[in-house]
């Protein structure tokens, strides 16, 4: 069955998430949840690192490096929404594992994995 997308942008986003997921799995992370949503936030990928750390991952894709590229598009407001969703997700767990926030930035011919891109204390702070 072919997935149905509301827009070309959503289709490109899903393909970017597929690329990020495959890359992270090659580096030992295991998928837990994809596209976790709650009121006020969303997380593209939730994965578990080999050491048990729960990794919340924002996937960003840009076709050009204008305006700082994909990684720069994870604004303080976006960080706050990811953290909000992560806190909601963590509240559903019986035990709180260690966690971190990563960004996977994609551009034509390039994938950059930024581990510990932001954290609970710095999310939402401007530059």
UniProtKB/Swiss-Prot annotation:
Pfam families in the cross-refs: UPF0102
One Gene Ontology term of the molecular function aspect: nucleic acid binding
InterPro entries reported in the protein's UniProt record: Restrct_endonuc-II-like, tRNA_endonuc-like_dom_sf, UPF0102_YraN-like
CDD domains: PoNe_Nuclease
Signal peptide location: none
Similarity annotation: Belongs to the UPF0102 family.
Official protein name in the record: UPF0102 protein Reut_A3265
Annotated organism of origin: Cupriavidus pinatubonensis (strain JMP 134 / LMG 1197) (Cupriavidus necator (strain JMP 134))
């Amino acid at each position: 069955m072919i997935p149905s997308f509301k827009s070309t942008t959503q289709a490109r986003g899903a393909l970017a998430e597929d690329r990020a997921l495959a890359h992270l799995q090659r580096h030992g992370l295991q998928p837990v949840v994809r596209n976790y949503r709650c009121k006020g936030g969303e997380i593209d990928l939730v994965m578990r690192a080999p050491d048990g750390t729960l990794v919340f991952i924002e996937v960003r894709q840009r076709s050009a490096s204008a305006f700082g590229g994909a990684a720069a598009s994870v604004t303080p407001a976006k960080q706050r929404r990811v953290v909000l969703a992560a806190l909601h997700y963590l509240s559903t767990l019986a035990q709180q594992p260690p966690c971190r926030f990563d960004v996977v930035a994609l551009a034509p011919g390039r994938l950059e994995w930024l581990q510990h891109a932001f954290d609970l204390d710095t999310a939402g702070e401007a530059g």
